Amino acid sequence: MKKSFIVWMGIALMMAAGMSSCSSDDEEKATDYDYLYHVSYFDQDPNLNKQQGYWYDETFIGLTPQKEPPYYLVAIWDSEEGEKALNYIVGKKDGVILNRYDLEGGNRVLLVSNKYISCPYLYISSSYTTNNIIEGDYIRICNMIIVKMKEGKSAEPIATKYAHSLKPNIEETKLSKTVVFDCILNTSYEVLQLAEEINQRDDVEWAEPNMWIPFHTYSRTRH
């Protein structure tokens, strides 16, 4: 009887240890917010060495993302998950984010960061320089694309073809006769690539990303 009792006690202790281990793993996983929000950190913009920019008539305006930290990243969110992910990233204790500055609009911030950040719940724009921008200034890419359709052409085919990347609502500006699309994308690189692709269409006069540009820069833009 005593031997049987010892065996059962051993089994019970093993089961308890297993449950404790599972509980510990679950708790660790539950608090791993990098995993929960799929946050990735990079020493440089992953698209640093790829061509980035936009077309102005027949001229390609090349944009170069920052190569060294601190990085000035614009983060935009449109969901509760995005806001939670942002607050987690900002609150990390290992000094990834040096400063946070709220921007006009209520759902966008400027992050001064030691790392380039990627998160599917956030739109992240790098800060870019170009040949004709004043030193120390940066261009940031908004998650919107402005399109000027050719006379008599509709923007609906664009909305249909790129439904996975553009929001269904189309905002038409009467004054300039342009169409503004909101993007369902995560990086400024993706917005630039899509704007360039749309710009090549036969029914489009021109297409550009919406940009935040310092008022005294020499960068050419139509808006």
Name the predicted role of every residue range.
Residues K2-I6, M15-S40:
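Bacterial Sec-dependent N-terminal signal peptides
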Residues E81-G91, K150-S165:
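Short amphipathic alpha-helix segments
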Residues A30-E83:
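Short Lys/Arg-enriched alpha/beta "domain-start" segment
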